[in-house]
Amino acid sequence: MADITVAELAKEIGTPVDRLVTQLADSGVNKSATDAISQDEKEALLGHLKKQHGDESEAKPNKLTLNRKTKSTLTMGHGSKAKSVNVEVRKKRTYVKRSEVEDEKLAEEAAKAEAEAAILAEADAKAKAEAAAKEAENEKGVAAAKAEVEAERKAEAKIEAAAKAKIAAVEKAKNVEQAPEKVAETEEAKKLRLAQEKETLAKVEAEAAAAAEAAKKLAEENEGRWKEQEAERKAKEKEVVHLTSSVYAQEAEDKSDSADESGRRRKKKKAPDRNARGRNSGRGKGKTLSSPQSLKHGFTKPVETKLQDIRIGETISVAELANKMSKKGAEVVKAMFKLGAMATINQVIDQETAALVAEDMGFEVVLVKENALEEAVLADRNDTGEEITRAPVVTIMGHVDHGKTSLLDHIREAKVADGEAGGITQHIGAYHVETGHGMITFLDTPGHAAFTAMRSRGAKATDIVVIVVAADDGVMPQTIEAIQHAQASEAPIIIAVNKMDKESADPDRVKSELSQHGVLSEEWGGEVQFCHVSAKTGLGIDELLDSILLQSEVLELTAVVDKMANGVVVESKLDKGRGPVATVLVQEGTLKQGDIVLCGLEYGRVRAMRDENGKTIQSAGPSIPVEIIGLSGVPISGDEATVVKDEKKAREVALFRQGKFRDVKLARQQKAKLENMFASMAEGDISEVNVVIKSDVQGSLEAISDSLLKLSTDEVKVKIIGSGVGAITETDATLAAASNAIVVGFNVRADASARKVIESENIDLRYYSVIYALIEEVKQAMSGMLAPEFKQEIIGLAQVRDVFKSPKIGAIAGCMVTEGVIKRSAPIRVLRENVVIYEGELESLRRFKDDVQEVRNGTECGIGVKNYNDVRVGDQIEVFETIEIKRSL
């Protein structure tokens, strides 16, 4: 199409001339109405209009070209003849959109179609214009010419619209055709890949099935032979005969046997005597000369490393483990670090950790039970026999002023058999009574303290608990404590309501108060028997004994008589004339004079036996308390007493238990004290604060308990192990020792027996008279168990004025201290333009050639930074300290 003027173009597209001139100027084409416009200028105008209407697809670049230039220097040759060559590498890379190459073909087709449409439109327009001009001049004039121009404009608009529709159809067809091709290609590739995977899987399954079939046939053929070989190997391993039961003695015995075997082999291979006489032993002609032989080394290098089995006990130190493996201690410590366990060379580790380390280093481990001897000794007993009914063991508990002692005295006076002279021996804590329905064994008040110790050790020496409550006084805090002990031992309870002869007796009040603590009488629908008795008049004593025997029948208590005895220590003491004396309650079997008894940490032969009346007896059956003499030491109350066969083995077991008890005692020294609670928390030993509280009145006790429980958080918890009203007793101290607790006394004090236990067990005991002080100290202890926070505080700043070189240290910074103090032991930072460039520590700090520990503000000094020499003039050296900030609740 020939170039036309701006006015003609405005007339063709039907827009005012002024508006078209403005749009051309906005697109960068400055034209007037009479100027001609080219095709490129029309395209520029069209792009500008599209951009204004939001179509920026053609405005965005489709290609991006990057030019890169790299310069480097290459040194050729060595020494003085070396030459440097400058190398410059230029790279040019063009990035094209993914769709551009594909769209070029479509763009070309669209351009061709548009050109053809334009040519046709131009020819048609020319023909129509010429015809219209002629007709206008000849026939109709100006009106006909205007109509023809309008028709020409409409025709061009239709042709342009048809061209655009064709371009859009081509683009749509391209998008529709591309998708099926890609989908078809993807489906074909997927089918091919699945077929290959299926074929490979079938081959692998066929090979695996063939291998399994071959292995099965081989196992069936050799099954019998393998079982015989395994049985022979196990039999050989078990053929280890030792004369002693000690592990160390067994190892020494094995070494001695191996030395003897090697000595016998050397004797067999010994050379003949050089002085022996014979036909060929003389000198001269009869002597035959042997041909010279090449010397052979006596040591043959092993083909592969032979690792020995090592025996590991329940506990072993790192040094002992290294010695058994013939390794250096540092190697074992390094191996433990790799496994995530940190230990020193003298630290004792458990059996599992030692086995893991040994197996990791390539050794085979044989785990040894150190208590194997103890189990063997206890198993070597005749435990078979006929079971018969035994007497119940009854513990009488209660407040000291509620008539417990009077009740025991009345039972003793009424039921001791005729002809038995003398009264009950006061220092023996157990005795038995014969009734018309059977025998009953009682544990008196000293047995109460032992009962707490038994409960902490898990021994169940008591069958029935009788709790004495005064009818005129009601339930006291120590009565509640007795109920707690009885419920913890899971023993049935019988309530004896004493002092019923008094006018102020109110048994219903006792029942009501006990029901608040989970003790319901049978009359109120519970399971606890209530007996109304009077120790003064003897009222209800027979009913109480009948209730005890009835409860024992329900329990169906049985024991074997004809076997070696075992029992529990009720009480023990050291007598000046007789030595260690222990009161033992026989639970099973028959204890005889001359038996060898293993009693906790002690052992010995029973040299004499006495009953509760002080009479010498020869034997004692089940549920009979006896006093034995002949032990090696004073046993602990609650320990188990067992009769064994061999005194030598009993001694070994006792010594082993003593060593184990020593380790446990050392471990128990880490008590939950207020001063070292944070240290214990860091070791992971304590996760909660155990407290035993004793107060003067019940109101204060409730207030303290509620306040302490409210202090508990997610990290630290307060656990009240026991609480009560009254003085701190021996029972409280024993309970605190067993549960690792702190004993808190509020306006109360500990009695003499409790102070002895507290001193021996190293229990933390605190007295308070103000509740706020108590809560504050416990709060501080809990805050100490929280993990601390750390904060860095700047203590000094020095400005570098000059830098010197030292042959020993390196760069020395001559500084002026501008703020605070510079300490040699504190860490430092080097700042350059207020940016930290190095963090480390000082290597030297000098003032006038003298080494100093600190330099204060306004003083010059020389500073050497360790492992850093890039100190420059103008740098700042900052000295700081790390401060630990304790967290609080």
UniProtKB/Swiss-Prot annotation:
Chain intervals with Basic and acidic residues compositional bias: 52-61, 214-241, 252-263
Positions of the UniProt region annotated as G1: 398-405
Domain of life, source organism: Bacteria
Domain tr-type G: 389-558
Subcellular location: Cytoplasm
Cellular component per GO, a single term: cytosol
InterPro entries, per the entry: DNA-bd_dom_put_sf (IPR009061), EF-G-like_DII (IPR053905), EFTu-like_2 (IPR004161), IF2_assoc_dom_bac (IPR013575), IF2_II (IPR044145), IF2_N (IPR006847), P-loop_NTPase (IPR027417), Small_GTP-bd (IPR005225)
GO molecular function per UniProt: GTP binding; GTPase activity; guanosine tetraphosphate binding; translation initiation factor activity
Region (G3): 444-447
Region (G4): 498-501
Residues reported in the UniProt entry to bind GTP: 398-405, 444-448, 498-501
Gene3D superfamilies the record matches: P-loop containing nucleotide triphosphate hydrolases, Putative DNA-binding domain, N-terminal subdomain of bacterial translation initiation factor IF2, Translation factors, Translation initiation factor IF- 2, domain 3
G5: annotated segments: 534-536
Sorted UniProt keywords: Cytoplasm, GTP-binding, Initiation factor, Nucleotide-binding, Protein biosynthesis
PANTHER family in UniProt: TR-TYPE G DOMAIN-CONTAINING PROTEIN (PTHR43381:SF5), TRANSLATION INITIATION FACTOR IF-2-RELATED (PTHR43381)
Similarity comment: Belongs to the TRAFAC class translation factor GTPase superfamily. Classic translation factor GTPase family. IF-2 subfamily.
Protein name (database record): Translation initiation factor IF-2
